[in-house]
């Protein structure tokens, strides 16, 4: 399941992020890659243990956990501290085809998560750079993702994916992973679809409609059945 979520950050918030990020010191992005990924990764990152990355990351997590669409799609249990990268044309930056590590550990907090879902939050407008598409492969083919600044995409961490070479400008983004309460991707997808159907019925019939209440109960009972907390 691939889900795009608009307006996670406002234009003003994106401008605040970029103001401090553009003035920051960046390092080689291979420092956070696994052995195989490091062979095909060429980009820059904010130091992941730096106060700037941590502070901006906390703001992103706060925005996402208040976003109903994100919570519905992810059913998050643990969210890894967001990281930040930059792909610049001047550095011939790109990230070849790879799959994310199954488990991620944060050395500062000791947090370890199973990576069920990957998230990319775009912090550059599409017209600021050429190339730099996030290409995600699944059973239905390849999907090229290039979203407005402030929007994010949520996709299974099991997916092969890549970032195409940036040929003009710079692509700035945040990226991270999460562990869902619902391990099984098919179950999680059904929960997301069911929640969407319930919300549509609420709009038409109201929260007190008996059938809406019954479906809401089924939703919570399925969460109870599948959740690992």
UniProtKB/Swiss-Prot annotation:
Molecular function (GO) terms listed? 2-oxoglutarate-dependent dioxygenase activity; iron ion binding; L-ascorbic acid binding
Q: Which residues form the Fe2OG dioxygenase domain?
A: 78-180
Query: At which positions is 2-oxoglutarate bound?
Result: 171
GO biological process assignments: DNA damage response; intracellular iron ion homeostasis
Keywords, in A-Z order: Dioxygenase, Iron, Metal-binding, Oxidoreductase, Vitamin C
SMART domains tied to this protein: P4Hc (SM00702)
Cofactor note as given: Binds 1 Fe(2+) ion per subunit.
Q: Which InterPro entries match?
A: Oxoglu/Fe-dep_dioxygenase_dom, PKHD_C, PKHD_hydroxylase, Pro_4_hyd_alph, Pro_4_hyd_alph_FE2OG_OXY
- EC assignment: 1.14.11.-
Kindly list the cofactors needed. Fe(2+); L-ascorbate
Q: Which PROSITE patterns match?
A: FE2OG_OXY
Q: Which residues bind Fe cation?
A: 98, 100, 161
Alphabetized NCBIfam families for the sequence: PRK05467.1-2, PRK05467.1-3, PRK05467.1-4
| Full protein name | PKHD-type hydroxylase RPB_2089
List the source organism: Rhodopseudomonas palustris (strain HaA2)
């Amino acid at each position: 399941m691939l889900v795009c979520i608009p307006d996670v950050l406002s234009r003003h918030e994106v401008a605040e992020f970029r103001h401090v990020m553009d003035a920051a010191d960046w390092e080689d992005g291979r420092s956070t890659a696994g052995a195989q990924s490091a062979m095909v990764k060429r980009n820059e990152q904010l130091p992941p243990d730096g106060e700037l990355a941590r502070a901006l990351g906390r703001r992103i997590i706060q925005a996402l956990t208040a976003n109903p669409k994100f919570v519905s799609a992810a059913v998050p249990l643990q969210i890894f501290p967001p990281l930040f990268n930059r792909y610049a044309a001047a550095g011939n930056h790109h990230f070849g085809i790879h799959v994310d590590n199954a488990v991620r550990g944060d050395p500062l907090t000791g947090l370890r998560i199973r990576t069920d879902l990957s998230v990319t939050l775009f912090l550059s407008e599409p017209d600021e750079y050429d190339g730099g598409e996030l290409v995600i492969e699944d059973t239905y083919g390849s999907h090229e993702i290039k979203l407005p600044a402030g929007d994010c995409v949520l996709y299974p961490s099991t997916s092969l994916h890549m970032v195409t070479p940036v040929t003009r400008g710079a692509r700035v983004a945040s990226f991270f992973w999460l562990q869902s309460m619902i391990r099984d991707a098919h179950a999680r997808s059904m929960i997301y679809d069911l929640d969407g159907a319930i919300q549509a019925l609420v709009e038409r019939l109201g929260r007190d409609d008996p059938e809406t209440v019954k479906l809401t109960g089924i939703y919570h009972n399925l969460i109870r059945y599948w959740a690992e907390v």
